[in-house]
Amino acid sequence: MTDAAVSFAKDFLAGGVAAAISKTAVAPIERVKLLLQVQHASKQITADKQYKGIIDCVVRIPKEQGVLSFWRGNLANVIRYFPTQALNFAFKDKYKQIFLGGVDKRTQFWRYFAGNLASGGAAGATSLCFVYPLDFARTRLAADVGKAGAEREFRGLGDCLVKIYKSDGIRGLYQGFNVSVQGIIIYRAAYFGIYDTAKGMLPDPKNTHIFISWMIAQSVTAVAGLTSYPFDTVRRRMMMQSGRKGTDIMYTGTLDCWRKIARDEGAKAFFKGAWSNVLRGMGGAFVLVLYDEIKKFT
């Protein structure tokens, strides 16, 4: 293997392992966030049974569905997240070579900053093309509030993918893809762009204390998550459309979804579950720091 191929493989492995560990740890927070986001678009959750907030959700889930249901959809998330994060990190470095080749970060700060934004956004959008059906399945499995057996909408990852494909074809598995690309570019641009720029401004980036790296990463993930959160809410709502027919269809398209959420639920509805997303972002920050630490040993 060439040095470039070895470097790419190391990036892929380091990013994937770091992501799998952190996502499993924050899976319960992830499910709470998803339920708060999509409950208005769920056929299983009637108006009188909707969750009032994070605490209500955390208390009711184990009572109604069992403690293990906090990890519902986690297998799909880990399977999805391994290639997603690994591809993000691997492509990020490749795109950095394209956008930042020959750029001096000390004398060309804004060009350096813009290059980091572009490489981060392009990496996120590229990887999304490959793993979107898994992200879709993870959302639908996490939104499934049935206790067991016949009450469940899907029996598992494979059952979810097969049922939606039979019902809506490949288009059903990519429902909400367009708004996802918009959101992912905004999120990844901040996630990678600001983080790399901040790290690059430190006197000795490779020997920065892990706590400083974590603080930078934590701030970046919180800002990036809140900035792109409305896009995430809309894409999750659109994902809930797949498999529906006739009058069960709530939104005719992405723009209609934006309009109806704003009109019927108010602007704050775009940010439902956002606080749990900030907590979940601690896992994202941990991924960035862990990735840098793993790379030191590869």
UniProtKB/Swiss-Prot annotation:
For this UniProt entry, what's an example GO CC term? Answer: membrane
Phosphoserine carried by residues:
7
Q: Which residues carry this modification: N6-methyllysine?
A: 52, 147
The catalytic activity, as recorded, is: ADP(in) + ATP(out) = ADP(out) + ATP(in); H(+)(in) = H(+)(out)
For this UniProt entry, which segments traverse the membrane? 8-37, 75-99, 110-130, 179-199, 211-231, 274-291
Residue positions where N-acetylthreonine is found in the record: 2
The protein's UniProt keywords, in alphabetical order, are: Acetylation, Antiport, Chromosome partition, Membrane, Methylation, Mitochondrion, Mitochondrion inner membrane, Phosphoprotein, Repeat, Transmembrane, Transmembrane helix, Transport
- At which positions is ADP bound? 80, 92, 235
* N6-succinyllysine PTM positions: 43, 105, 147, 268
- How would you describe the post-translational modification of this protein? Trimethylated by ANTKMT at Lys-52.
Q: Where in the cell is it found?
A: Mitochondrion inner membrane; Membrane
In the record, N6,N6-dimethyllysine modifications are located at: 52
Sites of the modification N6,N6,N6-trimethyllysine? Answer: 52
Residues bearing N6-acetyllysine are: 105, 147, 163, 166, 268
Q: Which InterPro entries match?
A: ADT_euk_type, Mit_carrier, Mitochondrial_sb/sol_carrier, Mt_carrier_dom_sf
Q: Which GO terms describe its biological process?
A: adaptive thermogenesis; B cell differentiation; chromosome segregation; erythrocyte differentiation; mitochondrial ADP transmembrane transport; mitochondrial ATP transmembrane transport; negative regulation of mitochondrial outer membrane permeabilization involved in apoptotic signaling pathway; positive regulation of cell population proliferation
Which PANTHER family does the record match to this protein? ADP,ATP CARRIER PROTEIN 1-RELATED-RELATED, ADP_ATP TRANSLOCASE 2
Family in the record: Belongs to the mitochondrial carrier (TC 2.A.29) family.
State whether it acts alone or in a complex, and with which partners, per the record.
Answer: Monomer. Component of the MMXD complex, which includes CIAO1, ERCC2, CIAO2B, MMS19 and SLC25A5/ANT2. Interacts with AK4. Interacts with TIMM44; leading to inhibit the presequence translocase TIMM23, thereby promoting stabilization of PINK1.
What's noted about domains in the record?
The transmembrane helices are not perpendicular to the plane of the membrane, but cross the membrane at an angle. Odd-numbered transmembrane helices exhibit a sharp kink, due to the presence of a conserved proline residue.
Could you identify this protein by its name?
ADP/ATP translocase 2
Q: Which organism is it from?
A: Bos taurus (Bovine)
